[in-house]
Swiss-Prot record:
Binding-site residues for Mg(2+) 2, renumbered to this chain: 267, 270, 306, 308
Source taxonomy: Bacteria, Pseudomonadati, Pseudomonadota, Alphaproteobacteria, Rhodobacterales
Family: Belongs to the xylose isomerase family.
Gene transcribed to yield this protein: xylA
Protein name, as recorded: Xylose isomerase
Subcellular location: Cytoplasm
Keyword check for Transferase: no
Catalytic reaction equation(s): alpha-D-xylose = alpha-D-xylulofuranose
Keyword terms: Carbohydrate metabolism, Cytoplasm, Isomerase, Magnesium, Metal-binding, Xylose metabolism
Cofactor note as given: Binds 2 magnesium ions per subunit.
Entry's Gene Ontology BP terms: D-xylose metabolic process
EC id: 5.3.1.5
């Protein structure tokens, strides 16, 4: 049954690269088999609730530009929003979706009312999932929008805010578990500081570590089989966030004994804000054993803030998927479009066309990455570059079997005098361009 919001638009289908239909896929064919799996199973696309159905189109200099019939804080409006959302997921053939609690339920007067409202909409979501076959990639709690969180959630100087946050996370984990979510995400938009003048860094680190440990403990208590994911971001809205980037989060996890329990949900826009490429963050997480999932979007490279735009750069996307595929692809994770329309894109069809374009770009990048994997030249180059470390003396150094004294004696005895070797960066860049 259609809501009428998208007019007479029918399900978006694959028409091929020569199609000029703006409401068709040109590169994303969910049934195309690549590296032994359907493209849908590789990419695991998800559509986010917040940017598509909650954001009103405002910016710091102007208010609402989107006119949506569900923009009311009532349960009736929340269910209408769900009807439109699941209709859009179905039109796009998006197998997954993601949400914050505050995206989907009316705001209550207190915690108990919030919980009742969330439980009611979860009942409705369960029905919609059954009807459509759409699944939940991950759920999360909004612990940043309400004024109570202005000084943080787990890192708040007020223990009552910490307690309220913990209780809210518990209800959101319950909701995610009930809906069969495959991950649970924590993003600490207010877990940081505006000024060090009023901040106790050690205290806040202890609080954040305790909260995340409780999340892991509760996961095991309720039998949630999905992954717990932390989403790094260096700043915005906070001046400085503690989960700055992949390497920083790993240090935090290690410090609190969670490195084997928690993985990362990495966003391209957040990587850019941290001064990294997206593939850097993915490769770092893979090297540290904490890669989980991705939010696919981009930032405007000239603006300097998180613009959350849909991806449109095939070479960037290809390198991201190359590093994902190189380590076996997604397990519980997927490709969530944490991207929003521009505030002038006010038509219902704009929502569809934005996702169609993003899905096509991801498909093009993914196919290029798969071709690079199958070709094997890049991987072999890296293997050959480090081949010297497979020799017995090199393995002994790496294994800690040789001291500095012993290594120094060997260098002198064997008159080791290494010569520089080309990194061949330009050759490798040309190689990548063959595929993208």
């Amino acid at each position: 049954m259609t809501t009428g919001f998208f007019g007479d638009v029918s399900k978006i289908t694959f028409e091929g690269a020569d199609s000029t239909n703006p409401l068709a896929f040109r590169h994303y064919n969910p049934d195309e088999v690549i590296l032994g799996k359907r493209m849908e199973e590789h990419l695991r696309f998800a559509t986010c609730y917040w940017h598509n159905f909650v954001w009103p189109g405002g910016d710091p200099f102007g208010g609402q530009t989107f006119d949506r019939p569900w923009f009311k804080d009532t349960m009736h409006a929340a269910k209408l929003k769900a009807d439109v959302a699941f209709e859009m997921f179905t039109l796009l053939q998006s197998p997954y979706y993601c949400f914050h609690d505050a995206d989907v339920r009316p705001e209550g007067a207190n915690f108990a009312e919030n919980t009742r409202n969330l439980n009611e909409i979860v009942d409705y979501f369960a029905q919609k999932q059954e009807e459509t076959g759409v699944k939940l990639l991950w759920g999360t709690a909004n612990l940043f929008s309400n004024a109570r969180y202005m000084s943080g959630a787990s890192t708040n100087p007020d223990p009552d805010v910490f307690a309220f946050s913990a209780a809210t996370i518990k209800t959101c984990m319950d909701a995610t578990h009930r809906l069969g979510g495959e991950n649970y995400v924590l993003w600490g938009g207010r877990e940081g500081y505006e000024t060090l003048l009023n901040t106790d860094l050690a205290q806040e680190d202890q609080q954040m570590g305790r909260m995340l440990n409780m999340v892991v403990e509760y996961k095991h208590k309720i039998g949630f089989k999905g992954a717990i994911l932390v989403e790094p971001k260096p700043q915005e809205p906070s001046k400085h966030q503690y989960d700055y980037d992949a390497a920083t989060v790993y240090g935090f996890l290690k410090r609190h004994g969670l490195e084997n329990e928690v993985k990362l949900n990495l966003e391209q826009g957040h990587a850019i804000l941290a001064g990294h490429s997206f593939e850097h963050e993915i490769a770092t997480a893979q090297a540290l054993g904490i890669f989980g999932s991705i939010d696919m979007n981009r930032n405007d490279y000239q603006s300097g803030w998180d613009t959350d735009q849909f991806p449109n750069n095939t070479p960037e996307v290809a390198l991201a998927y190359y590093h994902i595929l190189k380590h076996g692809g997604f397990t519980t994770g997927g490709t969530n479009f944490d991207a929003k329309l521009r505030r002038q894109s006010i038509d219902a069809e704009d929502l569809l066309m934005a996702h169609i374009g993003g899905m096509d770009i991801c498909a093009r990048g993914f196919k290029a990455a798969a071709a690079m994997i199958e070709d094997g030249t890049l991987d072999q180059f890296v293997t050959d570059r480090y081949a010297g470390w497979q020799t017995d003396p090199a393995q002994d150094m790496l294994a800690g079997k040789l001291s500095l004294d012993e290594i120094a004696k060997r260098v002198e005895a064997e008159d080791i005098n290494p010569k520089p070797r080309s990194g061949r960066q330009e050759y490798l860049e040309n190689l990548i361009n063959r595929f993208v």
